[in-house]
């Protein structure tokens, strides 16, 4: 009888310990924030390793349970996100609203849900890497920018894929040769995207 009592006590202690551990996991889950975060001078692009704020134009970020990945451009964010292994991470994506920000220095107070944004491609506005996709919360603001530049187009998040990014990069950088990336020391238009 004493053996059976010890066995039941051990089983009870193991179950109690398991419940305590399970409860700790719930608290940790509740503390995870998926809100956008500010960009800082020492942030490196997750894709290319360049300093994120050294370049003009909208930036992107992917906020996950385990942290934040930052990107020097919206195109770099899409390049990362469109990889099959990254799409399953359930990251929340954010981009700057260029309807509320200056092109040369986007305002981190105006980071918006990238999946709800409208993107303008085909403008001469320079960004960090590859195609410059100007991001907007408001479709009308995006259409106003596109109307200012012949050949520019407005597309929603779900219409951007790898082929679209490649075509946009080729159209924007057609004559730049192998070094298709503008350098941070080059002069850029100092006007706002809106």
Locations of regions flagged by a protein language model:
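C-terminal motif of bacterial Sec signal peptides marking the signal peptidase cleavage site
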Residues: 20-23
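Bacterial lipoprotein signal-peptidase II cleavage site
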Residues: 25-32
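Post-signal-peptide N-terminal segment of Sec-exported extracytoplasmic proteins
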Residues: 37-70, 74-78
